[in-house]
Amino acid sequence: IVQCLVGSEMCIRDRVDSSVYFNSSQVTNVDNLKTNVSNALQSYSDSVDLSKFGGRFKYSKVLNVIDDVDRAITSNITRVRIRRNLRALINQEAQYELCFGNRFHVNSAGFNIKSTGFTIINEPDICYLTDIPNADGRTGALAIVKPIEETGETRIVIGSAGLVDYIKGEVILTTTLITSTVLNDDIIEVQAFPESNDVVGLKDLYLEFDVSKSTINMVKDTISSGEKISGVGFKVTSSYSNGELKRG
């Protein structure tokens, strides 16, 4: 009997990766500044915008929350990721459907969908989910892959393991027998990059902003501090998604 699970929980979670630029001449303790940024983000997470059905993550508000923490902060580059938890039926054949309710950003090279690790029947090595976009950029194949540590290559274990609908924001994993998960409680975290940084929880999706799994990198603004007025050597942070296989 093949079971079909529509979602594993009715919750979509935001997280951010933020590079916070600061003027080092105005900061005595960088760790304290980082803590203050984290606390400010947690306060926003607890606000009326979020942690509810139909919630909305407001990107511009998050940028302002970070910038307003301290006058030493000069700017921030913040990337948004969304995830849902897939609770696997261990050692049982099952199909899984994860609805994010937000359109996905599509890089034609793939790696738009990422996951934490798991194992499947007849494959002892840790595997991951990823996507192979179709030429139309609207849909793609969901693939199960594994990294080859010796060569740095990614090997396809199952090339057609399901479907990704980038427009609807859906990930469908067809009949698969999962034997274990790297995370506790049989959980596989499945991540995507939203097309819009304003993320909306549809009426049947509970939206949370997970600050605990967000990344805050403090970066010295060498132009503002006067160290490198010309801008040569200034550390630039990309605003776009990366091509890594695993969910970070």
What would you call each of these model-derived segments?
Residues 13-17, 77, 187:
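Broad gene-expression machinery/nucleic-acid interaction feature
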Residues 26-124, 128-132, 246-247:
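An aromatic-glycine-centered, glycine-rich loop/turn in mixed alpha/beta architecture
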Residues 1-12:
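Single conserved hydrophobic/aromatic residue that forms the stacking wall/gate
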Residues 17-19, 74, 172:
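Structured core elements
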Residues 121-152:
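Short, basic/low-complexity N-terminal boundary segments at the transition from targeting/disordered tails
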Residues 18-24, 192-194:
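Flexible glycine-/small-residue-rich
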Residues 138-140, 150-248:
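Surface-exposed interaction regions enriched in Ser/Thr/Asp/Glu
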